[in-house]
Structures are given as structure tokens and as C-alpha cells.
């Protein structure tokens, strides 16, 4: 099924979005000419009730100051694309071909409880306006998931060793810790291939959520939130995504004493500099 936006908004997007730099995911293997990038696209949701749990767009010319599009209203109807009626944690990746975009979102209505969801949604587009979508319910899709409590914050990255797109997300089973898992998407980006496997868990065995992976100079950098033990953003690195050989950095990366989550890291256009942004969720704002 193809989800289409309202005509007035589609006209605006058609004029500008294809030359935007989608945040925070981007291709690591192929170097698309940065001269073709003119702005940054930010996808987000705004809260925990009603249509706040829906995909929105904002744009920026400098990577720091963003203007909401569509009067800060949803650009995709959550009730159409999800099984729960709400979506959270949107992430867009520009694919290796430079013209296809993958979006993944948490299929969840938080009013039903923080351990109520079992699914994510995979979306695909070539214009950032019209999206096909597929709901992946992990508990229904795979056996042995009877004690699954939640499926949170999926993201996508291209794995050069596998030659496939990896979807990774955090899951909680029973009374255990939230662990970041992964599975590869099929060629159509409509389903996952193989069983979900653990991608990362801190050496202390405690929960981690909101993984965000960025590749630079042969190294994959995983930014994650330490859930329930420090509640901040840390980083682990590896040269092979599925090797299990992660090196953890001990320090927290946020520059605030407030509780934070939802790290997103992206490169500034035309510069060898990166921005780490995160959600100061008790304040209702983002910080860089």
C-alpha cells in the first residue's frame, strides 16, 4: 500500500526534499557529491498522546536551526501505516543508490504502556512524499518470543560485509535487560530475513536503548542510551558490525545533567565535523 500526503504539502516537498540531507542516517560506502546537498531534513514525533505519536518533518539550512513543515502537523497518518495507531522514533536512511529512502518507526501507542508494543514499521520511498509500508510484528513473526515486552527505536544501516541493509532495534524480554538486536531486511524492504540476533549489550549487562550507528574511517560508532543506570549517551565502536567485538568508551557524551535519550549523529555538509543531537525529553527539547 502507498501512503500519500495532502496535495498542498506534496507540492512543497516536491520542490525541495530530494536535495536534502536526511538525518541522522546516511550512506557510508558511496560518497554522494555534497555540492548537491542544500539543507537537512529532520524526522521526529512530538509527544505521548493522540497525533503526537506521528511522523513530522522539519528542515534546516545549517544543521542547527530547524523549521517545522506542514505547520508541525503529521506528514503520514499513523493509523494507516501501523498496527497500534501510533508511531514513534522515526529514522530515515538514504540508500546506496542515492535516490531511495528507507524509514523505520516504532509501532506503538504509549498510552497502552511502555511495555505494550511488539512491532515496527518499514517504509520505502523515492521522493520522501509517497511511502509504501510493512508492519513487522516480532512476536508473531518469530517463535520463542512469548515473553517479549517491547520493540523500540529501529534504525537502518548498510552492512558492506553482508551486502545488505541491517535493521537494528532494542528489545526487552521478561525481566531481563533491553538489548540491541539486528536482522537484515529483504531486497524489497518489506520484511526481515533470518532470526533477530543480539548486536550489542554493555559489558555490565544492563539495559541499552536508542542505538544510532555512524561510520567514519573504517569504524562503526554506536551511540546508545544507558537505560536505568546513568540515563545518558555513551559510545561503543567496532570495525565489523556483527563481530561482537565492541570497544566501550566510559564517559557520557551529553552536555547536560538532565535526562536524555534518542541520540542522532550526522555530518555537517561540506565539513569534516559531526553533530550529536539528543532528546532532553523531560524538557521537551533537543540539544546539540
Task: List each language-model region with its residue ranges.
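Bacterial N-terminal signal peptides
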Residues: 12-22
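Sec/Tat signal peptide C-region and signal peptidase I cleavage site
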Residues: 24-26
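Bacterial N-terminal signal peptides that target proteins for export
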Residues: 2-13
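Carbohydrate-active catalytic/glycan-binding domains of CAZyme proteins
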Residues: 28-288
